[in-house]
């Protein structure tokens, strides 16, 4: 069987099969024969392996938002050869089969591409953390290159939010009494996943309270003893979460508490 040289440039080839003239056989010999030569041609497509080089990708992106990445498809046999494009690529997170980020994007004729990649194309939530972005040449999108991939890392930073704030109705608290308040911390970009063991800060009007950890359901509760010298009227309570290595910070304000002073006739 003929062997195609390893350095053959991918492309379409016409293969000539040649049978030479044979006019010299001794016809007195049994089974001998003479014939004129002929040629036959067959079409051949030479394919080579491909590789995707990612040239530019941001270090991080906010969950639910889009990021832009660029790169190029390379001839994996000889990276110095020009690629004969275009071809199509797809983009997805490694080990996440729930959705493809980009189903198909067409490269230029030299194999380069710039593509906008949504982190949550179906809008059904995305987990936060460091993820591996994979770019893969779509099988069959080019006659000359076999499927190849490239990858790079990106941090998907989750969006957080305080929900279920309490008290939810207007509440009057007397000076000298204690008032309870709190909320639930969730990762809104991941279907309101409850965030446990998060450090939460609270500020009652102008007074900072000791920090507390949210429980397994993401709930944190505070209690504040209102001093007799506290200002009267509607006050604002602010809850703070300073974020983490994979989550954005957030804050919220509770404005349902009014401080009053008891009177004696």
Predicted regions and their residues:
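Short flexible loop/turn segments that cap and initiate beta-strands
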Residues: 12-13, 75-96, 185-208
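Beta-strand-rich structural segments
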Residues: 64-78, 135, 174-190, 222, ...
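Enriched for extracellular/lumenal, surface-exposed ectodomains of secreted and cell-surface proteins
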Residues: 4, 9-37, 119, 123-150, ...
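Short beta-strand segments of immunoglobulin-like
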Residues: 55-61, 167-173
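Extracellular interdomain linker/stem segments of modular secreted and single-pass surface proteins
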Residues: 45-53, 155-163, 258-265
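Short, acidic Ser/Thr/Gly-rich low-complexity loop/linker segments typical of extracellular
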Residues: 100-110, 210-217
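Short strand-edge motifs at loop-to-beta-strand transitions and within beta-strands
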Residues: 1-2, 111-117, 152, 218-224
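Surface-exposed loops/turns
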Residues: 9-10, 63, 109, 127-128, ...
